[in-house]
A protein has these predicted regions:
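Acidic, glycine-rich flexible loop/linker segments
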Residues: 4-40, 44-172, 185
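Conserved alpha/beta-domain cores
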Residues: 133-381
Length: 381
C-alpha cells in the first residue's frame, strides 16, 4: 500500500500511528472550534493552552520544535503519536483531509493507510487485557536498591498509573495546572484581589496526585513557564516581556526572586503550604527549576522560609540540575538541597549552546543528550 508522504519531521511522542482528519489551526481558539476526538492536530507549535485539544487528538504534527519541545513532552505523556519540526505542515496539510501520522517513520501520509486502520481497530479491545497484564506483573517486580520515581504532568493521568510499582512522583509539572485548570496569569489574580482563588486552584491540582499515591512522595516543581508561555495565559501580555530566546531567559529561580514575579511565587508557596498543613498531605515536596547561582538559590529558599516552607525531616527540597553551573558547583549546591533531578534536555542545551527548540539543529542531529561533553558533566555531578 503506497500513500504520498506529505511531510517529514522529527520523532516525538508515542511510536505508532494516528489516522484521522487533519485539523490545521493557528491558535488554541481555532482548535476549540474544530477539534474532535481522534482528529489530527496540525499547528505551527503547541503551548500549554493547546493541552485540552491535544488530549482529543489522535496524533499531532507541528511545523516547529525538537525532541524536547512542548508538543513532544505532552504527546509522550498522553501516549499519542507526534511528528514535530516538519517546517511546512500547516502549509501543505488541509483541514478535513484524512491523513496517517507514522511516528515510527516520522512522516505524515495523505489518506488513511488501510493496514494501519485495521491494526488500530483491532487494538481497541486490547486495553483490558493490557491493564490485567500490568496488574499481573506487579507482584513479580523485584525489590531494588534504586528507587523508581515517575514524571507526571497531567494530574488526572495519575489514575492510570497509581497502581504501578513506583516509589513516588519525582517530577510533577505545575505548568499543566496553570494552563489547563487555572488559565489566567497569576499576577492577574494578585492585581484583581483574587490571590486566594489562585492558591486554592493550584493546591487542588497538586492534591489530586498527592492523595492518589500517599504516602508516596510527590515532588512538585515550581512553575517553569518561559516568558512566551506566560504571555499565552489570560492577562499575560501585561506582565511579560518579549524575549528573543525565552529558553535562555527569565525563567525558573530568576523569576521567583524578581520584583516583577515574587508575589506570584509566594502564591505557589502558599499552595504547597495548604496541601501540607491544611490538608495533611505531608508527601508533597518541592523542586526548584533552572537553578543558576548560589546567591539566587539562597534568596529563593529565604522566600520559601517566610511562607512557611523549610527543609525538614518530612519536607524535602530538590533542585533541577539542568545548568552547567549547578553541575560544576555541585558540592556547594548540595549543601542547600536534599536531592537533584537531572534535566538532561536543558543541560544539553547549556553545554552545547543549542536552542533545544531549534527544528533545524534537531534535524541536523546536533541535539544529542549522549554527547561526550554532556555525559562527562553529568558524571561529574
Amino acid at each position: 500500500e503506497m500513500l504520498n508522504v506529505v511531510v517529514k519531521g522529527i520523532a516525538a511522542g508515542k511510536r505508532g500511528y494516528g489516522i484521522g482528519p487533519a485539523k490545521v489551526v493557528s491558535n488554541p481558539e481555532e482548535a476549540a472550534q474544530v477539534m474532535k476526538k481522534g482528529d489530527i492536530l496540525v499547528t505551527d507549535m503547541t503551548n500549554p493552552d493547546y493541552v485540552p485539544f491535544m488530549k482529543l487528538a489522535g496524533a499531532i504534527v507541528t511545523d516547529k520544535g525538537g525532541v524536547t519541545c512542548h508538543a513532544a513532552i505532552v504527546s509522550r505523556e498522553l501516549g499519542i503519536p507526534c511528528v514535530v519540526g516538519t517546517e511546512k505542515a500547516t502549509q501543505v496539510m488541509t483541514t478535513g483531509k484524512e491523513c496517517t501520522v507514522d511516528s515510527k517513520s516520522v512522516v505524515a501520509y495523505e489518506g488513511a493507510m488501510a493496514t494501519m486502520t485495521a491494526q488500530l481497530t483491532s487494538s481497541e479491545g486490547a486495553a483490558p487485557s493490557q491493564a490485567a497484564f500490568v496488574g499481573g506483573t506487579f507482584q513479580a517486580v523485584p525489590t531494588t536498591a534504586t528507587k523508581i520515581y515517575m514524571n507526571l504532568g497531567v494530574p488526572e493521568k495519575i489514575e492510570d498509573y497509581k497502581d504501578l510499582p513506583f516509589e513516588g512522583i519525582g517530577l510533577m509539572r505545575t505548568e499543566f495546572i496553570l494552563a489547563s485548570y487555572i488559565g489566567t496569569h497569576p499576577l492577574e489574580y494578585v492585581e484583581t484581589g483574587r490571590s486566594q482563588e489562585f492558591v486554592d486552584k493550584l493546591a487542588d491540582g497538586i492534591s489530586t496526585v498527592a492523595r492518589a499515591i500517599q504516602p508516596r512522595p510527590v515532588v512538585v516543581r515550581f512553575s517553569d513557564f518561559k516568558t512566551n508561555e506566560y504571555r499565552e495565559l489570560k492577562g499575560g501580555e501585561k506582565y511579560e516581556i518579549v524575549e528573543a530566546n525565552p529558553m535562555l531567559g527569565w525563567r525558573g529561580c530568576s523569576r521567583y526572586i524578581s520584583k516583577w514575579y515574587e508575589k506570584a511565587f509566594r502564591l505557589e508557596c502558599q499552595a504547597i503550604v495548604k496541601c501540607r498543613k491544611e490538608w495533611g498531605l505531608k508527601n508533597v515536596w518541592v523542586m526548584l527549576p533552572v537553578v543558576r547561582t548560589l546567591w539566587e538559590t539562597k534568596a529563593v529558599l529565604e522566600i520559601m522560609r517566610q511562607e512557611g516552607l523549610e527543609r525538614s525531616k518530612d519536607f524535602k527540597v530538590w533542585f533541577m540540575a539542568e545548568t552547567p553551573s549547578i553541575a560544576i558547583l555541585a558540592d556547594e549546591f548540595s549543601k542547600l538541597a536534599d536531592g537533584f533531578s537531572i534535566g538532561s534536555n536543558d543541560m544539553t542545551q547549556g553545554i552545547l549552546m543549542i536552542d533545544r527548540d531549534s527544528e533545524r539543529l534537531g534535524q541536523m542531529g546536533y541535539f544529542d543528550e549522549r554527547d561526550p561533553a554532556v555525559e562527562r558533566i553529568i558524571a561529574h555531578l
